[in-house]
Amino acid sequence: MVRTTLGVVIGTAASFILFTSQAPKIKAAEDVCQGSGKVANLDFTVKDINGKDVALNAFKGNVILLDFWATWCPPCKKEIPGFIQLYNTYKSRGLVVLGVSVDDSTSDVKKFMTQFKMNYPVLIGHDRDDLLRAFAPMPGYPTTFVIARDGRICSQHTGFLPLEQFEKKIKALL
């Protein structure tokens, strides 16, 4: 009787440990969008790297990773390869990655894009104080926003953040 009871207790404990120690589940979108839940102002038309007008509100209904960056910014250079990877992996599920360069020189941005093999849209934001104010405060670069399909800003981060942390948020929103 003692052995049977002990076996049941050990088996139950082992099962509990096994099932609760598995990889954490992806959080629901509501858990990811903690904070103010401010709706992103996407009512802007911005020029892309080739001078073409891009209406940000055309991306409503998608999960948007909006990254304000510069070619001279070391943490930006470190993050961009991860954004390329995220874009390649999740664009078919509704992820849009938009880079907003704050550089003065479009030719420098084009060289940078070629060097880093950037394949997502890059917009020119250096002369767009209205756009920068809409997403303020931005204490530095990179400043990256993750925006849910319903337009809520789910996170804002300034500085380098590992790919895995962005991916966790994005997967929960897709």
Place the predicted regions along the sequence by residue.
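N-terminal "domain-start" segment that seeds a small globular fold
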Residues: 25-56
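Bacterial N-terminal signal peptides
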Residues: 9-17
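Rossmann-like NAD(H)/NADP(H) cofactor-binding core
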Residues: 66, 98, 121
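Structural microenvironment flanking redox-active thiols in thiol-disulfide oxidoreductases
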Residues: 77-116, 127-133
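Conserved redox-active cysteine motifs that mediate thiol-disulfide chemistry
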Residues: 60, 68-85
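Alpha/beta-hydrolase fold active-site loops
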Residues: 63-64, 142
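Thiol/disulfide oxidoreductase modules built on the thioredoxin-like
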Residues: 112-119, 125-171
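Bacterial N-terminal signal peptides that target proteins for export
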Residues: 1-9
